[in-house]
Amino acid sequence: MQVTEGQLVALQDARFALVAARFNDLIVDRLIDGAADTLRRHGVPEEHLELIRVPGSFELPLAVQRVADAGRADAVIALGAVIRGGTDHHQYVAAECTKGVAQAMMGSGVPVSYGVLTVETVEQAIERAGTKAGNKGAEAALSALEMVDLMRQLEA
């Protein structure tokens, strides 16, 4: 059986867009740093990285869709943090963000890595943004690198 899978390689011409929420910026900024650092460490030139900020995670899908449709990137990395509050609001934001980002990926054919934290507490968010549980932004960047390579293999 022939196996095709993406590798963690940076193709010198690959472009990456990080679309990140400003809400919960103390957390999201760490996710951005983790994603950008990972891409740089894998050889992606600075001029091939673009950061696009949106007000909150609910707005991520539209910006992701526009970036993907415009052909501005070979992969998009969605970054945000949805933290439970005193109401059910976070559930609706998280669900619509997840669904919208997935629809943007499927509709555009451009890989979108999901680095949006959906957590119960600020402490959990901090853990997933670079302390005990690693950096989910960095993990999303690794997924994006692999998917760009895989998409190019599948097109060949």
Swiss-Prot record:
NCBIfam families: lumazine-synth (TIGR00114), PRK00061.1-4 (NF000812). PANTHER family: 6,7-DIMETHYL-8-RIBITYLLUMAZINE SYNTHASE (PTHR21058:SF0), 6,7-DIMETHYL-8-RIBITYLLUMAZINE SYNTHASE DMRL SYNTHASE LUMAZINE SYNTHASE (PTHR21058). HAMAP family: Lumazine_synth. Keywords: Riboflavin biosynthesis, Transferase. (2S)-2-hydroxy-3-oxobutyl phosphate binds at G86, T87, R128. GO terms for molecular function: 6,7-dimethyl-8-ribityllumazine synthase activity. This is 6,7-dimethyl-8-ribityllumazine synthase. Pfam families: DMRL_synthase. Belongs to the DMRL synthase family. Its EC number is 2.5.1.78. 5-amino-6-(D-ribitylamino)uracil binds at F23, S57, F58, E59, A81, V82, I83, Y114. GO terms for cellular component: cytosol; riboflavin synthase complex. Forms an icosahedral capsid composed of 60 subunits, arranged as a dodecamer of pentamers. The active site is at H89. It comes from the Bacteria. It catalyses: (2S)-2-hydroxy-3-oxobutyl phosphate + 5-amino-6-(D-ribitylamino)uracil = 6,7-dimethyl-8-(1-D-ribityl)lumazine + phosphate + 2 H2O + H(+). The keyword Metal-binding does not apply. Pathway: Cofactor biosynthesis; riboflavin biosynthesis; riboflavin from 2-hydroxy-3-oxobutyl phosphate and 5-amino-6-(D-ribitylamino)uracil: step 1/2. CDD domains: Lumazine_synthase-I (cd09209). GO terms for biological process: riboflavin biosynthetic process. InterPro entries: LS, LS/RS, LS/RS_sf. Catalyzes the formation of 6,7-dimethyl-8-ribityllumazine by condensation of 5-amino-6-(D-ribitylamino)uracil with 3,4-dihydroxy-2-butanone 4-phosphate. This is the penultimate step in the biosynthesis of riboflavin.
